[in-house]
Design a protein with these regions (language model features):
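Acidic (Asp/Glu) and glycine-rich low-complexity loops/linkers
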Residues: 2-12, 22-117, 121-136, 147-156, ...
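Conserved acidic catalytic centers in enzymes
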Residues: 47, 139, 219
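Short, surface-exposed interaction patches in beta-rich subdomains
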Residues: 163-251
Length: 251
């Protein structure tokens, strides 16, 4: 019985040492690098990473990832454009495995353009104030804006990805979807809103106070409009549907 107790105790100590070693190893793998950048107002992402954006006083980038992924991210800033990409020699299966291990934090005083190519993510959790803003997604990635104030905005989606804007205040908006993706916008105010859907995707826009809405659908996709607007002009070709049951037009 005494030998059995000693054996159990020894086994527990060994297991505890292994678990402790694994925990320390996992923590030590993570590394953070931060640096200042020249002024930029456009961001182009062609890497399967998650990019967080905050509008602030300085231009900077911070990368949080694992040691084994250091050097895989290529960042270039020139002509007012910040480009974030992967080293082309890295194999795709490694990139897919690394996607959830990499967080990129970007700060800039201005933002007039965001382009996401592929399966990455772009998240803006704060307010973005700009005269003009163009959002482009080509691929299966995700773009999320919490709050946007601008004069003119263009939202373009080509592919199967998702674009979501929780709060939008603008004078003129252009929303274009070509593919099977989804666009969802909550528009607090807009003077004119132009919508074009070609494909099997879905566009959902809620208007708090819109003046004129021009809507065109070609394909099997669906457009759902809700809220309040003054005028609505709609055209449809294909098996898709333009749902205006929740849209109230001012008299």
């Amino acid at each position: 019985m005494k030998r059995r107790k000693v054996l159990i105790f020894t086994t527990m100590v060994a297991v505890g040492f292994i678990v402790s070693s694994c925990f320390k190893s996992t923590r030590s793998e993570f590394r953070s690098t931060e640096e200042k950048l020249p002024y930029f107002n456009k961001i182009v992402i062609s890497a399967p990473v998650r990019v967080h954006f905050i509008q602030g006083d300085k231009s900077s980038i911070k990368i949080v990832n694992k040691n084994k992924h250091q050097g895989q991210i290529i960042k270039e800033c020139h002509g007012g454009v910040l480009e974030i990409s992967w080293n082309s020699v890295i194999k795709w299966n490694i990139l897919k495995k690394s996607e959830k291990d990499v967080e990129v934090y970007v700060t800039s005083p201005d933002l007039i353009g965001v382009t996401l190519k592929g399966s990455g993510e772009f998240i803006s959790s704060g307010k973005v104030d700009s005269d003009n803003l163009e959002i482009t997604l080509a691929g299966s990635g995700d773009i999320l804006f919490t709050d946007i104030i601008c004069d003119k905005i263009k939202t373009n989606l080509r592919g199967s990805g998702d674009i979501k804007i929780n709060n939008l205040q603008c004078l003129h908006s252009e929303t274009t979807l070509m593919g099977s993706g989804d666009i969802k916008i909550n528009s607090e105010s807009s003077t004119t809103s132009d919508i074009l859907l070609k494909g099997s995707g879905d566009i959902e826009i809620n208007y708090n106070n819109a003046n004129a809405i021009n809507c065109k659908l070609e394909g099997s996709g669906d457009i759902e409009l809700s809220g309040m607007a003054k005028t609505l002009n709609k055209q449809k070709r294909g098996s898709g549907d333009i749902d205006i049951n929740k849209l109230r037009l001012k008299q």
